[in-house]
Amino acid sequence: PRRLYGEAGLIRALGELVGDDGGVLSRSPLCQSEVISLLVQLRACYHAVRRDPPQALEAILALLVPPLLTLVHGDGSLGSWQGSWAIDAADLAALVAATGVRTRPLRDVRQWGYQRVTAQKGLLLLDAAPPPLARHARTGCASTLAFEFSHAGQRIVVNCGGAACAGGLVPVRLEQGLRASAAHSTLVIDDANSTAVLINGRIGGGVSEVEIDRRTLVSEKGAGATRLEASHNGYASRYGLTHRRILILRDDGTELRGEDLLVPSGGKGKKGKVGFAIRFHLGPGIEVGLSEDGQGAGLALPDGSYWQFRSGGGQVTLEESLWVDGNGRPQPIQQLVLQGLVSRGGGNFAWLLKKMG
């Protein structure tokens, strides 16, 4: 009876921790992997004493693995979301193998809040949800509408990541900054977070609504693409503007078109113009050269490929950044920043990332 009572409590606790699509309520892939690891160890304890684990344990493992795979890049390592860092491919593969679950990544994990688009060697990940509620997360991040993009296992656009390992190789003083909107590849207004980042890992007010639309496009020539359109209200009350992001990844994976729109939301907000910055944190080892007209850049990747970034009119600058690697170590990287001023009437800012040759 004591064991049955304990098992019932475990299953109840897991039910309160995990959403209907299998994602933990912290929205953190690191937490997702930790829960999976604990359940694998628990199952091993049952086997060690020659007892059968509860059937619900296997069912929950089968529910947890597909969302985790959603946020795995082509190189097999983890994306940098909600405080997680780029956990090593070998560690992730060993964890998934230990579960015994054979499955594929989910593409549209709407309740957990992520979108995954695969296009041959190209892979796009988008955060399409508000940050987690404060009671569910230790390192909640203001990352709504941020994206990561990789091609042939090479990370091209990333988030800084690593807030959850602050205090180790990542200095504690960086934790707050790593949780900020500016530490993610998204648009930021007036250097303000889309959702308030508070001390002790908590999240305050900001984004409460996110709309997401996903569709497949086919041109007259037969070429295809996947289009994601999402918007959030995190800046509406302060600036009277809604951020809408459109991402179109061509089916061959070599061209990503983006458009960031600031749409008047009818709120009061600040008068006059405010600054905005669209940040593209670049993967490790990428060499960058700005174009002469100041509206683009060339990206030389470690694998020898060359990509071009172009803005639809705004000035592009190059700034320093950092990325937390698979060992939890901060590595120096660079970021492209498309910035300018916008009025309460809003504006739209297009950009293109394309593989050359």
PLM region spans:
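Alpha-helical cores of eukaryotic small-GTPase signaling modules
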Residues: 1-19
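Short alpha-helical "patches" and their helix-cap loops
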Residues: 4-5, 51-60, 291-296
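Secondary-structure boundary elements
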Residues: 12, 152-154, 252
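Short, charged, low-hydrophobicity "junction" segments
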Residues: 12, 97-102, 200-202
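Carbohydrate-active enzyme catalytic cores, enriched for enzymes
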Residues: 19-158, 162, 219
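CBM-like, beta-strand-rich accessory domains located in the C-terminal region of large
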Residues: 169-357
